[in-house]
């Protein structure tokens, strides 16, 4: 599945549900590894509150939970014009979608990972600046708990970031990993860095980090495992609008 938000109006999105009023949330799907794609499927009415100004995807990537539930991170501007991050999910392979409660107010671009069976972590861009907001849910977003690392462990300059969970059986370290990438700074969008956590996101030691680009760029990124030894990162760098690099885990995690 690929999730996009389409703005029909020329200038802005407003409360409402129709294309003339508000941005439309669309899905396209592929059943042949991306060779062909379906026509867009409009799911706005399934997940958007009419009072919201708009509802957007993460951006970044969604996940499939161990029980098969599909999950996308989302963000929306509520009736008071405050941004909020959360998740939407499907338990029937994308036929129907559901959205419950926001994870933390005044947050926007987020990424989701299943850190334990049934436990989702949402890592969020926080408009307060300085560091990432992090929350967890055990009930698909009905209730949220602030994570101990929230607003302290991962610095940011108010920018998008990427987060993935890599299970022990799927990587050469034999340990459960969280991998994270963003501009590792509180000012500007520079020092694009990949970090690893071996304790479920509580800590991100400097010995488990690799700097990719220290110069100024746009700073958005997306991580994905290539094989058990290698993670790929697609990011906005200082040398090109979009750059792809393949990084060995042994260059990130020094044991």
What are these regions (language model features)?
Residues 1-255:
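Asp-box/BNR beta-propeller blade signature and adjacent active/binding-site loops
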């Amino acid at each position: 599945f690929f999730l996009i938000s389409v703005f029909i109006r020329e200038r802005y999105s407003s409360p409402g549900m129709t294309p003339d009023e508000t941005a439309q949330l669309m899905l396209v799907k592929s059943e042949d590894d991306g060779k062909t794609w379906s026509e867009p499927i409009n799911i706005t009415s399934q997940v958007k509150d009419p009072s919201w100004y708009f509802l957007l995807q993460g951006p970044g990537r969604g996940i499939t939970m161990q029980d098969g539930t599909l999950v996308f991170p989302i963000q929306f501007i509520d009736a008071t014009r405050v941004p909020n991050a959360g998740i939407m999910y499907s338990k029937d392979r994308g036929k129907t979608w559901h959205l419950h409660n926001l994870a933390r107010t005044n947050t926007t671009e987020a990424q989701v990972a299943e850190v334990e069976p049934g436990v989702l972590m949402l890592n969020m861009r926080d408009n307060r600046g300085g560091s990432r907001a992090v929350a967890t849910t055990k009930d698909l977003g009905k209730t949220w708990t602030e994570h101990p690392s929230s607003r302290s462990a991962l610095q940011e300059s108010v920018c998008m970031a990427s987060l993935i969970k890599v299970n022990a059986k799927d990587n050469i370290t034999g340990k459960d990993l969280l991998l994270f990438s963003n501009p590792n700074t509180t000012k500007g969008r520079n020092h694009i860095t990949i970090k690893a956590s071996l304790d479920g996101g509580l800590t991100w030691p400097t010995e488990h980090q690799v700097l990719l680009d220290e110069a100024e760029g746009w700073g958005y990124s997306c991580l994905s495992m290539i094989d058990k030894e290698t993670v790929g990162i697609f990011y906005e760098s200082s040398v090109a609008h979009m750059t792809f690099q393949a990084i060995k885990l042994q260059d990130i995690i020094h044991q």
